[in-house]
Swiss-Prot record:
Residue ranges, compositional bias (Polar residues): 372-381
Region annotation Disordered: where it falls in the sequence: 360-381
Name of the protein in question: Probable outer membrane protein PmpI
Topology of the protein relative to the lipid bilayer: Peripheral membrane protein
Organism encoding this protein: Chlamydia trachomatis serovar D (strain ATCC VR-885 / DSM 19411 / UW-3/Cx)
Chief site of localization: secreted
InterPro entries attached to this UniProt entry: Autotransporte_beta, Autotransporte_beta_dom_sf, Polymorphic_membr_middle, POMP_repeat
Length: 878
């Protein structure tokens, strides 16, 4: 053995020892060192190790009473194909603590033990801990007794940081992977997976009397485990004592129980006392058992659920019955077991599978006859189920994840044998769900929401403070049904949340509707107060609701009648961006004209070819102040052309180019534009005046995309537009002595004109709308001053322009927008931006022999809008 290894191991042993007195050391080959101290034994690894049998000396020390610490020092320990026939061949700790820690990778794979032997790792009368390890893998291990991989009186799995997996372990007894009296699965950084473990008796993955699973900051997965009771976890007690059989899942990041199964009770979990609180999302999906599809609570036990940092979901869990086959079930409460509370704070509690509570008067559970116990007697002293939620959270019972064939009474009915107290927040029944309980009380600040088609049944008198019926659930056949000996409801109202589109229902609301059923009562009950017909403001169809009672031999029905008036389009439909596209074209053509005017200035040359990058940013907001009327436009492209500039300041320019643009409003609509541009410019100069003229032609193809938030489909459409613009300019140059900041300045005035039209079109997908053709014409009068500076020494040319622009005449024509599915139309006019504007432009040109570079920056400020343009170009002069 290397001396430095020996010294390091001695140091570790000294640190761990309170007395630092060494009784002896036992090398384990070249891999590890056993150090005997007065109070404990330390096994220290100093290299990676792979083995098919454990160190005999390590197993011998494990059988002694002193605590044993196995330290990995960030090395790997791989144990595989270990077949134990004698406890002396395993980590068998009858007394004292056993700790395995600080391994980079710890693996026990394909190991097995006979019935007379314990698990691969076994501890009794002490504490077993696996902590501070990187990755851990316990796979395909088997025990003829209990605990396929690990068995212990007290076991803690803590502070592990990479990945932990217990997969495909099995046992003939309890705990396919782990069997313990108490188990702490806490404060791990690593994701933890229990997958495809199997136990012949209880707890496919874990079987223990008390389990605390808390503070794990990465997901926990329990998938594909199986057992007789508790497909994934079993925490029950043979003795009827409250301190036994408890399971606590608290403050974990995310937890998934999926595809676990039990032959008898608890597809995912079978426990006596269970608390689920302050976790991230917790999901129970596709679990199955004979009793308790996801969770079964032992007789005399309790269950409490608090959705703290994420929702709790029960979906597609089922229990097997002899006469009904598979029946959906989330939770089964055995005789005298209670569901103490459902509390939704920062997440919802969603039951897409029903709850069943066994009647105290029954001798054994009969899950195939759920309806027979609807009105079974309940002692007056039964503990109530307390339901509380925050303002925007709900406890939801729903069958919306069921197919029509699966919507049978057993799959729809949640049967409770204890009173319900709705203290605060929202209790929601959706999509034909049925809730049955001995009684239900509702505090004034709480809200009961029942969709049409759902039912509430109580065996005692029912007094409700507020009942809300969601508008989106209404149709001409289904209604809310309430069964109670006597019923009183202080307030009934129709609700429509902001993200629902009930008033967009063309089939139901575009015409007058009579006899829409809202609420059905038994004939023994009396009429209730009619709902309030006054509606809050909304988009879509506008109209009036009226209500009345209709009596029949079957009972009383509350009937709603609808009288339509008009239609107010949803803001997501009201896009003005299409009409305002002509403003974008106008701004782009101004940027092109600015670039062409720049080419007309500068040094003289006989003939030149040039090219330039052109960019334009245009921001606008209408005076309405609505986000839908605010938009911005960006374009980038190029121009290339030929030009000449004489010594007498005569000039001529011919150019063509392309711009690619994208526009979007402050809402959900965007357009992409491809523009093709051609322009010509000429200037004549005299000693007293310069006269120039310019004409520009633009043809564009536009594509509209609408990413609806309130409607399901994305809208798409395309259209074509054509625009022409021109200007005539007269300027009077004044030459200074050339010694100042500028060598000359000019006073100028222009007459500018713009005319643009765009075709009407229909969208090809989404909420299909038809947009009318529109046009925009504008005549303006810019006036201002320019300053020039030519430097012969540096061959630089500077040019500054400042102008005031007054629009003389503006003419806008635009038609309505039509929603084709109901032929409703509305106006989406073009924005009326200010008729006054200010323009500033700064240009620099520099001659480099035959090349001439160009930089042009301009800014236009107008009431409710402003734009920037930047051009970079070069000219080759012949």
């Amino acid at each position: 053995m290397r001396p430095d290894h020996m010294n390091f191991c001695c140091l570790c042993a000294a640190i761990l020892s309170s007395t630092a007195v060494l009784f002896g050391q036992d090398p384990l080959g070249e891999t590890a060192l056993l150090t005997k101290n007065p109070n404990h034994v330390v096994c220290t690894f100093f290299e990676d190790c792979t083995m098919e049998s454990l160190f005999p000396a390590l197993c011998a020390h494990a059988s002694q009473d002193d605590p044993l610490y196995v330290l990995g020092n960030s090395y790997c320990w791989f144990v595989s194909k270990l077949h134990i026939t004698d406890p002396k061949e395993a980590l068998f700790k009858e007394k004292g603590d056993l700790s395995i820690q600080n391994f980079r990778f710890l693996s026990f794979t394909d190991c097995s033990s006979k019935e007379s032997s314990p698990s691969i790792i076994h501890q009794k009368n002490g504490q077993l801990s696996l902590r501070n390890n990187g990755s851990m893998s316990f796979c395909r291990n088997h025990a003829e007794g209990s605990g396929g991989a690990i068995s212990a009186d007290a076991f803690s799995l803590q502070h592990n940081y990479l990945f932990t997996a217990f997969e495909e372990n099995s046992s003939k007894g309890n705990g396919g992977a782990i069997q313990a009296q108490t188990f702490s699965l806490s404060r791990n950084v690593s994701p933890i997976s229990f997958a495809r473990n199997r136990a012949d008796l209880n707890g496919g993955a874990i079987c223990c009397s008390n389990l605390i699973c808390s503070g794990n900051v990465n997901p926990l997965f329990f998938t594909g485990n199986s057992a007789t009771n508790g497909g994934a976890i079993c925490c029950i007690s043979d003795l009827n004592t409250s301190e036994k059989g408890s399971l606590s899942l608290a403050c974990n990041q995310e937890t998934l129980f999926a595809s676990n199964s039990a032959k008898e009770k608890g597809g995912a979990i079978y426990a006596k006392h269970m608390v689920l609180r302050y976790n991230g999302p917790v999901s129970f999906i596709n679990n199955s058992a004979k009793i308790g599809g996801a969770i079964a609570i032992q007789s005399g036990g309790s269950l409490s659920i608090l959705a703290g940092e994420g929702s709790v979901l029960f979906q597609n869990n089922s229990q097997r019955t002899s006469d009904q086959g598979l029946v959906r079930n989330a939770i089964y409460l055995e005789k005298d077991a209670i569901l103490s509370s459902l509390e939704a704070r920062n997440g919802d509690i969603l039951f897409f599978d029903p709850i069943v509570q066994e009647s105290s008067s029954k001798e054994s559970p009969l899950p195939s006859s759920l309806q027979a116990s609807v009105t079974s007697p309940t002692p007056a002293t039964a503990s109530p189920l307390v339901i509380q939620t925050s303002a925007n959270r709900s406890v939801i019972f729903s069958s919306e994840r069921l197919s029509e064939e699966e919507k049978t009474p057993d799959n729809l009915t949640s049967q409770l044998q204890q009173p319900i107290e709705l203290k605060s927040g929202r209790l929601v029944l959706k999509d034909r769900a049925v809730l049955s309980a001995p009684s239900l009380s509702q505090d004034p600040q709480a809200l009961l929401i029942m969709e049409a088609g759902t039912s509430l049944k109580t065996s005692s008198d029912l007094k409700l403070a507020t009942l809300s019926i969601p508008l989106h659930s209404l149709d001409t056949e289904k209604s809310v049904t309430i069964h109670a000996p006597n019923l009183s409801i202080q307030k009934i109202f129709l609700s429509n949340s902001g993200d629902e589109n009930f008033y967009e229902n063309v089939e139901l609301l575009s015409k007058e509707q009579n006899n829409i059923p809202l609420l059905t009562l038994s004939k023994e009950q009396s009429h209730l107060h009619l709902p309030d017909g006054n509606l809050s403001s909304h988009f879509g169809y506008q109209g009036d609701w009226t209500f009345s009672w209709k009596d029949s031999d079957e009972g009383h029905s509350l009937i709603a009648n609808w009288t339509p008036k008009n239609y107010v389009p949803h803001p997501e439909r009201q896009s003005t961006l299409v009409a305002n596209t002509l403003w974008n074209t106008y701004s782009d053509m101004q940027a092109v004209q600015s670039m062409i005017n720049t080419i007309a200035h500068g040094g003289a040359y006989l003939f030149g070819t040039w090219g330039s990058a052109v960019s334009n940013l245009f921001y606008a907001h209408d005076s309405s102040g609505k986000p839908i009327d605010n938009w911005h436009h960006r374009s980038l492209g190029y121009l290339f052309g030929i030009s000449t500039h004489s010594l007498d300041d005569h000039s001529f320019c011919l150019a063509a180019g392309q711009l690619l643009g994208k526009s979007s409003d402050s809402f959900i609509t965007s357009t992409e534009t491809t523009s093709y541009i051609a322009t010509v410019q000429a200037q004549l100069a005299t000693p007293l005046m310069k006269i120039s003229a310019q004409a520009c032609y633009n043809e564009s193809i536009h594509e509209l995309k609408t990413k609806y938030r309130s409607f399901s489909k994305e809208g798409f459409g395309s259209w074509h537009s054509v625009a022409v613009s021109g200007e005539v300019c007269a300027s009077i140059p004044i030459v200074s002595n050339g010694s100042g900041l500028f060598s000359s300045f000019s006073i100028f005035s222009k007459l500018q004109g713009f005319s643009g039209t765009q075709d009407g079109f229909e969208e090809s997908s989404g909420e299909i709308r038809s947009f009318s053709a529109s046009s925009f014409r504008n005549i303006s009068l810019p006036m201002g001053i320019t300053f020039e500076k030519k430097s012969q020494k540096t061959r630089n040319y500077y040019y500054f322009l400042g102008a005031y622009i007054q629009d003389l005449k503006r003419d806008v024509e635009s038609g309505p927008v039509v929603l084709l599915k109901n032929a409703v139309s509305w106006d989406a006019p073009m924005a009326n931006l200010d008729s006054r504007a200010y323009m500033f432009r700064l240009t620099n040109q520099r001659a480099l022999h035959r090349l001439q570079t160009l930089l042009n920056v301009s800014y236009v400020l107008r009431g409710q809008s402003h734009s920037y343009s930047l051009d970079l170009g070069t000219t080759y002069r012949f």
